[in-house]
């Protein structure tokens, strides 16, 4: 079942340690088949160096029940499922504890747009969610994490297709894309942007967002209706 999607998710998960986004098993990638409403995700707690395509777990988008697989799905599965349910255009999701993006999440700070590297991928500020409540933490924590992410985008009027990443307060980053590989790509860029911004704001604590015209130019030439740019 979903052999090609399993292969894509497996390879995307292997890309996380390759790009230094994870320590031990601190990360996961998933992808969705929208026609079948099925999600393929990394198994829980399996080391990357022994993981195989057959270890990937298939779960139902709406119930979270295992449809295929002999291992437990990632503990973050309910978060992934909530994002797929609420953000209908995304096809792949990545969660990591990559160092610099997690620093921003632990500080509870947004990553503002200050340079063209950011503008090439994110059409504005990368938001950090609010702190979760005691009730949310003690309840269905992973599902509530997804709901807090969705709430952040809705309450701030952010389009998830334009800002394909978020920082969960005191936790870490999630990134997404059109498929698993694209989601990993965005997670790599998020980590790089977090690193750049950390030092930029140390050098200039009064740093303000980049010019709107420059942000428009860099984002729209790559993602707009008349996109033309590629390196």
Swiss-Prot record:
Ranges in a coiled coil: none
Keyword annotations for this protein, in alphabetical order, are: Carbohydrate metabolism, Isomerase, Metal-binding, Zinc
Q: How is the cofactor bound?
A: Binds 1 zinc ion per subunit.
> What Enzyme Commission number does this protein have?
5.1.3.4
Which positions in this protein are listed as binding Zn(2+)?
A: 76, 95, 97, 171
Task: Read off the Gene3D superfamilies from this record.
Answer: Class II aldolase/adducin N-terminal domain (3.40.225.10)
Q: Which cofactor does it need?
A: Zn(2+)
Q: Which Pfam families match?
A: Aldolase_II
Identify the InterPro entries for this entry.
Aldolase_class_II_sugar_metab (IPR050197), Aldolase_II/adducin_N (IPR001303), Aldolase_II/adducin_N_sf (IPR036409), AraD (IPR004661)
Binding residues for substrate: 27-28, 44-45, 74-75
The disulfides recorded in the entry are: none
Q: Which GO terms describe its molecular function?
A: aldehyde-lyase activity; L-ribulose-phosphate 4-epimerase activity; zinc ion binding
- Catalytic residues, per the record, are 120, 229
Quote the catalytic activity from the record. Answer: L-ribulose 5-phosphate = D-xylulose 5-phosphate
Q: Which GO terms describe its cellular component?
A: cytosol
* GO biological process annotation, one example: pentose catabolic process
What does this protein do, in the record's words?
A: Catalyzes the interconversion of L-ribulose 5-phosphate (LRu5P) and D-xylulose 5-phosphate (D-Xu5P) via a retroaldol/aldol mechanism (carbon-carbon bond cleavage analogous to a class II aldolase reaction). May be involved in the utilization of 2,3-diketo-L-gulonate.
Record-stated family: Belongs to the aldolase class II family. AraD/FucA subfamily.
What is this protein's record name? L-ribulose-5-phosphate 4-epimerase SgbE
- Give the species: Haemophilus influenzae (strain ATCC 51907 / DSM 11121 / KW20 / Rd)
């Amino acid at each position: 079942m979903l052999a090609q999607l399993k292969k894509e998710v497996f390879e995307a998960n292997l890309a996380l340690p390759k790009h230094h986004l994870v320590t031990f098993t601190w990360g996961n990638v998933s992808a969705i088949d929208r026609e079948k409403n099925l999600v393929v995700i990394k198994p829980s707690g399996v080391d990357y160096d022994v993981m195989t395509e057959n270890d990937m777990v298939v779960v139902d988008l709406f119930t979270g029940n295992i449809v295929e697989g002999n291992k437990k799905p990632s503990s973050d599965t309910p978060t992934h499922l909530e994002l797929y349910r609420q953000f209908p255009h995304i096809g792949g999701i990545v969660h990591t504890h990559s160092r610099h993006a997690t620093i921003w999440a632990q500080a509870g700070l947004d990553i503002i747009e200050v340079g063209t590297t950011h503008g090439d991928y994110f059409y504005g500020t990368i938001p950090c969610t609010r702190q979760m409540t005691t009730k949310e933490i003690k309840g269905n924590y992973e599902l509530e994490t997804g709901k807090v992410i969705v709430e952040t985008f809705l309450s701030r009027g952010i389009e998830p297709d334009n800002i394909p990443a978020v920082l969960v307060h005191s936790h870490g980053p999630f990134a997404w894309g059109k498929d698993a590989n694209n989601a990993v790509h965005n997670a790599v860029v998020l980590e790089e942007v977090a690193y750049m911004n950390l030092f930029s704001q140390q050098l200039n604590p009064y740093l303000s967002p980049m010019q709107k015209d420059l942000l428009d130019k860099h984002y729209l030439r790559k993602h707009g209706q008349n996109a033309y740019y590629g390196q």
